[in-house]
Amino acid sequence: IADINPDDIESISVLTGAAAAALYGSNAANGAIVINTKRGKVGKMQVSVSSNTDFSKPFVMPRFQNRYGTGSKGKSDGSSTNLSWGPLLNDASRRGYEPRDFFDTGMTYTNSVTLSTGTEKNQTFFSAAAVNSEGIVPNNRYNRFNFTFRNTTSFLNDKLKLDIGASYIIQNDRNMTNQGAYSNPIVPVYLFPRGDDFNLIKVFERWDPARKIKTMYWPQGEGDLRMQNPYWIAYRNLRTNNKKRYMLSASLSYDITDWLNVSGRVRVDNSNTKYEQKLYASSNTTLTEGSTQGFYAIAKPDESQVYADVLANINKRFGDYSLVVNVGASIVDNKYDELSYRGPIRANGIPNVFNVFDLDNTQKKARQDEWEEQTQSIFASAELGWKSMLYLTLTGRNDWASQLANSSSTCFFYPSVGLSAIISEMVKLPSAIDYLKIRGSFSSVGMPYPRNLTSPTFEYDETTQTWKPKTHYPIGDLKPERTNSWELGLDMRLFKDFNLGVSWYLANTFNQTFDPKISVSSGYTTIYLQTGYVRNQGVELSLGYGHTWKKDFRWQTNFTLSHNKNKIIELVKDYIHPETGEPINKDRLDVGGLGKARFILKTGGSLGDLYTQADLKRDDNGMVEISPAGALITVNNQPDIKLGSVFPKCNLAWSNQFSWKGFNVSALLTARIGGIVYSATAAAMDQYGVSES
């Protein structure tokens, strides 16, 4: 979506639940966003030009302390050059450093031109757009250029329609800021010692007469986060992406009768990307894999998708009954091919010359990653209506996914059924209720497991430069993941201007494929199991109001609330070990985390539960103990201590839109209520003594 020119979009609609899954497959099990792009209009040629400029600055920053200077334990002895636990600063020693000053004013320039023309039989649309952005972090750039063409033609008394389109996108970026510590200049900016002069490091490189090159100036040291001069990261740790993408589409539809239509569509989406990473000499050796000469990496991933479908659409009335039927078949083929080369620049190489010939022959790594997935499908949906007040909806889809090759289940079927009734059309309601509909549905959606689990594959060992077979235990009977969902809902319109929607849902997911880290002999290192049972249950509420005064001023407001409760009903229970025949039971699974904070799945818990196995040492009264040296004492390898769940209790949103004589003003407020947040940024700031807390 981010690659699409906003001026090319005609409308955006959202499909949810079974309707999305029936048309677009298991990838749309949670819904689908359908974007309709513009087409040419009948009439005189129209040319539209638009231009806008956005400015950005950091809005909310962490709270920093500027009372204590460089050092540790209240002293400045020169041994702790990157900590701010030093002596109290005074007017003479206070530098007045403000991290906000590191950031630039970000600017984004967007310019576009569109052309529309057409006759009753042929319509043409063309657009060109450019987005040029300079980020708030120094030396961060993003550019995108879009070119779009679409032509629609009618034949045979408008019964036959041909629609063709083409888009070409050029995108390049430099130093997009990522999360983590090593390649993120914000880390040393936030943790910079408060007793040092930040202005001195703005000249981030100095001439090294011995090496005859400029090297990084960073007297503060790397610390345990491998920090570098933030300006060196911005200007001498370069990461660039250059992407070219083209999309071609064609559709042909024919109206056999006024109630029967057939159509066929094909879409091709290809992208070619070139990624480069250049780390200059004297960069942190953790990043350069030990080289003081620098590091170079290049990768060229190519991605392609071909989608095609045929559809038959029926829309007919039979007296009091209406029938809408869609029957079709589709195929989608995804391919990925990446060739990459990386390594440190050799000791006798030329510093800061970035090409594959200058890499260390003993450490350079060449890789190629290639895969293909294909899914063939047939699907159908039918909606039977009675007197425009009662509707029965049925959908069904069967997928043959390549991930299921060599398994006992080579395809999977997922159906749905829904019933809705417009009560306001059936009985007379109080005058305050303009519209009332109740609805209920059930759907069962399948999802294929990861590719190559059931097909023999080999992986390349970069260390030994040999091919090795995958070492997971031979898999027998694997089945697709399955989610069964129930939903009940109510939609109302009150007092002409109010809208109310309420939904309750229950979703059970099982047959999940994962590696529970159980012991396997016979030379295998892992075994994949299909088990698990996770439940999601919740409610969604929406309330809206819209009114127009004197045909000029309109106010529209919408409030939404959602609450979801996630619960792990079962992890691994009575799974028979294929070697020993013994039952396997697991009610705890560590799925990773950051530092001492770990996401641990437990029966009865949720997927967002966060635990720790470290705590501060406390006395018999529960008070935190302090060592004779004045340091906190930590105790590791404790039983799981639950910190909480990262899932919120509910999500809230409130939007307002005001319009008056062509002027529009809008505002959106969102909130997450409940749930915990683990901030590695806050933890690092506390450790280095720069946070206000």
Please annotate each region the language model reported:
Residues 87, 99-102, 231, 285-286, ...:
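Extracytoplasmic gating/loop element in the C-terminal half of outer-membrane beta-barrel translocons
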Residues 86, 106-109, 144-145, 150-156, ...:
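Extracellular/periplasmic, surface-exposed regions of secreted and cell-surface proteins
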Residues 1-17:
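Short acidic/polar hinge/loop motifs at secondary-structure boundaries
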Residues 48-93, 178, 340-342, 529, ...:
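Conserved small-residue
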Residues 114, 556, 645-673, 693:
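Conserved C-terminal beta-signal and adjacent last beta-strands/turns
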